[in-house]
Amino acid sequence: AEAQRLVTLIGDIIRLSQLDEGEVLPKERLDLLEVAQGAADDLQAEAEKKNVHLSVSGEPAELEGVRQLIYEVAYNLGDNAIKYNVDGGSVSINVSSDGKNAKLTVSDTGIGIAAEDQSRIFERFYRVDKSHSKESGGTGLGLSIVKHAVQYHGGRISMDSAPGKGTSISVSLPIQ
């Protein structure tokens, strides 16, 4: 388990350094719904282990993007929504498009995030609840990767959250 955590950490650091250095990564035409479904499929076992219901809904939304980065966005948002959820809670991933932007929204019934922490959760290694870190695992880089991947694609992130009320994070990506 510790070896796998280190491999994940190294991979996360490499991805962030590529984005920091402005490395040009190859874009392709992809369907955000298909990528989100793939991330959800990969998260299903973790959701079941935590007794969290995970669902994906929406419509196909094509865009020009780096598949691995878009996957990381969906996976990391879904992973956090599961990690910081309550027993018997739910996570819903929804994809939509307005013709100009493809939108991914991950909503959960979890512990929520206080207003004073919301501006910091996308910082590297920042954790709202340090006591929860050991049991939930992770590298502390997932949401930083989300932020950088969204910026790389010229997108925006918005959040609606309150302690005890859950969290909804939306990512809007230009279709180009």
Task: Label each residue range with its predicted role.
Residues 108:
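Acidic ATP/Mg2+-coordinating residue in the GHKL
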Residues 154-155:
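Conserved glycine-rich
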